[in-house]
Amino acid sequence: MKHPQSVCYEIKTNLTPERLETINKYGCCAFVLLWCLGIEPDDLQAILLVNDMMNAGVIEKDCTVHWAEACRFLTGREMAVEFKDIKSLYGLKDRTPVRYDYKGKSHWVGVVRGMIGFNPLESSQCVEKGRPVSARLLKLK
């Protein structure tokens, strides 16, 4: 434990119930981006970091990620982002954001060495019943 009261104050002043609900429902992509960049704070700090990214405009109010801008915000480095349609996880070696789709819904997970290495949810129907459809290949410029 470090400064729980300070964290409580930060949450109260920076996260409206609406913002927290948006991050809860749609923040998977942002959390996966953090993981793929090797940024692995505790869960509370991750939520606060996503909120900071929204305030900075590198993530939209609906949690849509502006990939290159978000990478620069988080790392201070320029990154190229390639959008790639996929049908399987095969061949994805480095940490890669991957979107799964199922019945009109989507969910993002982090993949490494062809396997899911990080899922921001304990379980997801999109992952369990759906299929991978899209990846974001992140490369330092």
Model-derived segments and spans:
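Conserved active-site-adjacent core of cysteine acyl-enzyme catalytic domains
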Residues: L34, G38-K141
